[in-house]
């Protein structure tokens, strides 16, 4: 069933275009190289069809596993836009190298600071603070995220 879904997504994403594919908890996909091949194809070829990929993961260190880095490196290095938040307890030097950032850029996100991220757009880098409007804050509730 999983591969049927990926095949359907591939068809929509790469032939019809104008699609957005969102992968949350992406570290769960890293266990399957066939799924990674699909996602790598989406990332590399989707822009030609005006399609976009959103990848979210709380475990960025898993992307650096030598067994899968040939799949994950293009997934991480190809996108035009990246939002990097606090990466957690990781090997700093490995993360800096893998994400293609420098020490001062890493310093923006090295501590947990709610709402702060490093936004990368091509060669441009920005320190962003994401603030939810008051009417949206009610949607988040009071548990977690601190």
Predicted segments — roles?
Residues 1-15, 107-146:
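Conserved P-loop NTPase motor module
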């Amino acid at each position: 069933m999983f591969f049927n879904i990926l095949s359907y997504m591939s068809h929509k994403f790469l032939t019809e275009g104008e699609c957005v594919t969102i992968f949350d908890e992406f570290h769960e996909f890293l266990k399957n190289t066939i799924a990674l091949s699909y996602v790598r194809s989406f990332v590399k070829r989707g822009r030609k069809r005006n399609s976009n990929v959103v990848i979210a993961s709380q475990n960025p260190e898993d992307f650096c596993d030598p067994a899968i880095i040939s799949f994950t490196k293009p997934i991480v290095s190809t996108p035009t836009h990246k939002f990097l938040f606090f990466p957690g307890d990781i090997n700093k030097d490995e993360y800096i190298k893998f994400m293609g950032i420098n020490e001062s850029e890493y310093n923006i996100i090295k501590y947990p600071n709610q709402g702060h991220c490093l936004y990368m757009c091509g060669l441009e880098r920005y320190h962003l603070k994401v603030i939810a409007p008051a009417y949206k804050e009610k949607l988040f509730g009071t548990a977690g995220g601190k």
